[in-house]
């Protein structure tokens, strides 16, 4: 009986989020028309409650439900950062959704179900639970991307995402099925133990690793599996894009940890070489093609591909320090992307999407504070000290050099310098170009403005004092290998 209760105790945050997602849906159904903010308020309460429950679990470890669920340091820390990302999206979203007539409870319900999918992925101890979490996240994302039915671009982006996402899920599932056929178990720890005794030349095992790596690369947005990313980021409502660029990246990182580190560490040399190729291609494609973009959402999409390349440097290192630096980079990228897309949301207004880089011309004259915040974001993405983006890049470079991949670090540094161009171009447009004649007024939004200020200034504060966040990420990854 005590063991049974302990199993449910481990999963209390997930149960809380699932229950509250249903409550938000029902509350919006019965009272949503009269109380327009009800769903958003309940969502914030859900995230706050989940954070409290997760904090109470800190320090505990174990498995539950016959190995389907794993509670460890990484589970707790990754879930906390996921709550933060979804909270920021909710705070940024209100005026944008109201202006477009889509401020409805379904948006927040889908966000909560997507969050639940991330939580299940992060805590998955079995191929089955990891895949179920992945599909829950993916289905919620497809619906969110196509939610704005009046937008042809959103509908088109949703269809593209669905078709390519289904293909990637199929690849991942096929790789998992091959692993199951080889080992006869779904438990990732048992799979890892069985793989130690297998030869690297086993053809079925090679195919399994390739298919799983391809599926993970798609979910991350790593090149050459990035085809969906620019179109979906550009076509989706900016609120949804802000979500896609943040919390799901933590979930994708969890896929690597659970499937390749926990489940395939015995075959590290095999999947490491695949990720070396993914890293180089992502760095080149993301940073070079972003230079040619005039649409800022599309530019940030290609920059995401580049950032994924930097994050994969830590994965390639394959050490505990490398994985911790990769997790640190993922968290920092999440904060940077939230601030970047949050600024696009603030500059947009009813009937106008601030999607072109030219829409930010003269922002320093129109809204000096917003321009300053956006400058911090761009500097952090470029890796300019003293922003936290610099320390994130430095951490992965140190890890990959320590692992013996000096040439890979050199490639990363060169492409970081190239990538700085398109970030600094946005700063130049804001400070040195005159506002366009049709620029219009920026509508005041106190809640989103306060959230953006905290988000952007955090990039500067964490750059001056990176130690606590870095230590927290290292704490999460301790003992993973």
UniProtKB/Swiss-Prot annotation:
GO terms for cellular component: plasma membrane. Its EC number is 7.1.1.-. It holds the Pfam family Proton_antipo_M. The keyword Transport applies. The chain crosses the membrane at residues 11-31, 38-58, 69-89, 107-127, 128-148, 162-182, 203-223, 237-257, 271-291, 299-319, 327-347, 370-390, 401-421, 457-477. It comes from the Bacteria. It is a multi-pass membrane protein. GO terms for biological process: ATP synthesis coupled electron transport. One of its GO terms (molecular function) is quinone binding. It is found in: Cell inner membrane. It catalyses: a quinone + NADH + 5 H(+)(in) = a quinol + NAD(+) + 4 H(+)(out). Keywords: Cell inner membrane, Cell membrane, Membrane, NAD, Quinone, Translocase, Transmembrane, Transmembrane helix, Transport, Ubiquinone. InterPro entries: NADH-Q_OxRdtase_suN/2 (IPR010096), ND/Mrp_TM (IPR001750). NDH-1 is composed of 14 different subunits. Subunits NuoA, H, J, K, L, M, N constitute the membrane sector of the complex. NDH-1 shuttles electrons from NADH, via FMN and iron-sulfur (Fe-S) centers, to quinones in the respiratory chain. The immediate electron acceptor for the enzyme in this species is believed to be ubiquinone. Couples the redox reaction to proton translocation (for every two electrons transferred, four hydrogen ions are translocated across the cytoplasmic membrane), and thus conserves the redox energy in a proton gradient. HAMAP family: NDH1_NuoN_1. Belongs to the complex I subunit 2 family. This is NADH-quinone oxidoreductase subunit N.
């Amino acid at each position: 009986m005590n063991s049974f209760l302990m199993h449910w105790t481990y999963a209390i945050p997930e149960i809380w989020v699932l229950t509250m997602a249903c409550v938000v849906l029902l509350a919006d159904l019965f009272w949503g028309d009269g109380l327009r903010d009800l769903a958003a308020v309940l969502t914030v309460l859900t995230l706050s409650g989940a954070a409290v429950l997760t904090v109470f679990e800190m320090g505990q470890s174990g498995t539950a439900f016959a190995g389907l669920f794993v509670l460890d340091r990484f589970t707790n820390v990754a879930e906390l950062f996921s709550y933060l990302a979804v909270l920021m999206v909710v705070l940024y979203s209100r005026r944008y959704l109201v202006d477009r007539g889509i401020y409805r409870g379904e948006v927040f319900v889908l966000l909560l179900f997507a969050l639940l999918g991330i939580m299940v992925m992060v805590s998955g101890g079995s191929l089955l639970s990891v895949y179920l979490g992945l599909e829950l996240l993916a289905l919620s994302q497809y619906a969110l991307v196509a939610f704005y039915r009046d937008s042809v671009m959103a509908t088109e982006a949703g269809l593209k995402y669905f078709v390519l996402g289904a293909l990637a899920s199929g690849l991942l599932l096929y790789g998992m099925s091959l692993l199951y056929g080889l080992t006869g178990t779904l438990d990732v720890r048992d799979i890892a133990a069985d793989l130690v005794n297998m030869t690297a030349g086993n053809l079925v095992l090679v195919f399994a690793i390739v298919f799983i790596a391809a599926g993970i690369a798609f979910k991350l947005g790593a090149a050459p599996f990035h085809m969906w990313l620019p179109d979906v980021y550009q076509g989706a409502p900016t609120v949804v894009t802000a979500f896609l660029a943040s919390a799901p990246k933590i979930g994708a990182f969890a896929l690597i940890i659970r499937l390749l580190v926990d489940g395939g560490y015995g075959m590290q040399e095999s999947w490491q070489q695949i990720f070396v190729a993914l890293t180089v291609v992502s760095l080149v494609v993301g940073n070079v093609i972003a230079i040619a973009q005039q649409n800022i959402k599309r530019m940030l999409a290609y920059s995401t591909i580049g950032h994924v390349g930097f994050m994969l440097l830590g994965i390639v290192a394959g050490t505990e320090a490398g994985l911790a630096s990769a997790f640190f980079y993922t968290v920092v990228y999440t904060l940077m992307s939230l601030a970047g897309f949050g600024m696009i949301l603030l500059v947009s207004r009813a009937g106008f999407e601030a999607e072109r880089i030219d829409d930010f011309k003269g922002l320093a004259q129109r809204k000096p504070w917003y321009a300053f915040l956006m400058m911090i974001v761009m500097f952090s993405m470029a890796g300019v000290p003293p922003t936290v983006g610099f320390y994130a890049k430095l951490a992965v470079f140190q890890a990959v050099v320590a692992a013996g991949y000096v040439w890979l670090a050199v490639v990363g540094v060169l492409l970081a310098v190239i990538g700085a161009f398109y970030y600094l171009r946005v700063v130049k447009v804001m400070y040195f170009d005159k506002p366009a004649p049709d620029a219009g007024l920026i509508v005041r939004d106190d809640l989103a403005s306060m959230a953006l200020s905290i988000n952007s200034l955090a990039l500067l504060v964490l750059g001056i004092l990176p130690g606590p966040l870095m230590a927290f990420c290292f704490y999460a990854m301790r003992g993973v290998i």
